[in-house]
Amino acid sequence: ELNSKKLIDDAVFCFAIGEDNEAKEILLNVINHEPRNVDALRAISEVCLSLQELKLAESFCRRALTVDPDDLTSVVSLARILVKNGDKEGAEEASSKARILGWKEELASDSE
């Protein structure tokens, strides 16, 4: 049985200390076993962005958003990736969605 939480934590640690390729390898392993793991998809998107693999970063980020369209972190990541890709219009659209999701989260936490 794959301990995806531990593996993702290991990958995040590798990423934090600059071992991007090691982090990517770990995350690909998790995604091969759990293709809809939003945490792994979100993390590998950031790793690919760091490696300047923009198309791959965008692809993994969009996969995370397919699983959870309202994932604020993924929407913000997508905006950053699109900016780096030179897609100003797409980045503005993603940024706008991120603001709306942020407000929704804020309102939800205020009403608790």
Residue spans of the language-model regions?
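Structural signature of tandem alpha-helical TPR/SEL1-like repeats
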Residues: 16-26, 51-63, 85-97
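Structural marker of alpha-solenoid helical repeat scaffolds
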Residues: 33, 67, 100-105
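Short acidic DE-rich linear segments
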Residues: 105-112
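Alpha-helical segment of the N-proximal tetratricopeptide repeat
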Residues: 2-33
